[in-house]
Amino acid sequence: MESKEPSPNLEIRPVRPSDRAAIWAIFESVIRAGDTYALPRDMGEAPAMAYWLKSGHEVHVAETQGRVVGTYILRENPAGGGADIANCGYMTAQGSEGRGVGRAMCMHSMERARARGFRAMQYNFVASTNDRAVRLWQQ
């Protein structure tokens, strides 16, 4: 399926405490599927939110018409001397795939990474079967 341009009403903004339930709903459906993240499929809400909303992570949500349809984290790459390399993780809500949400979050995260002084972006753990993500990251 070809990715469509995001809705003109799509807003990407910093996370708010009130977004927690929406982020958990997205996170839970993504990890339960088990085909995009190297995280335990049975991970509970508390450890999942501790992982995603961890201090040092810059967290954003994609919202359209008052509904959170995606979320991403931006952080220093955790590997060794890679503090000048950014790492991101993205999750899109079920039913919002193929609508440009992931692409919009990717472009936003690249802008944020540049603004923070990162020199490059590294994507860790992109499953080869995640066709949409692989195509996006290859562009």
Residue spans of the language-model regions?
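Acetyl-CoA-dependent GNAT
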Residues: 14-17, 36-95, 106-108, 112, ...
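Short, polar/acidic, helix-capping and beta-turn segments at strand->helix junctions
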Residues: 130
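Conserved acetyl-CoA-binding loop-helix of GNAT-fold acetyltransferases
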Residues: 98-113, 134-139
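A short beta-loop-alpha structural element at the N-terminal edge
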Residues: 10-23
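Conserved GNAT acetyl-CoA-binding A-motif
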Residues: 113-126, 135
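Short acidic N-proximal helix/loop "leader" segments that mark the beginning
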Residues: 1-6
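Hydrophobic pocket/interface hotspot
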Residues: 23, 27, 48
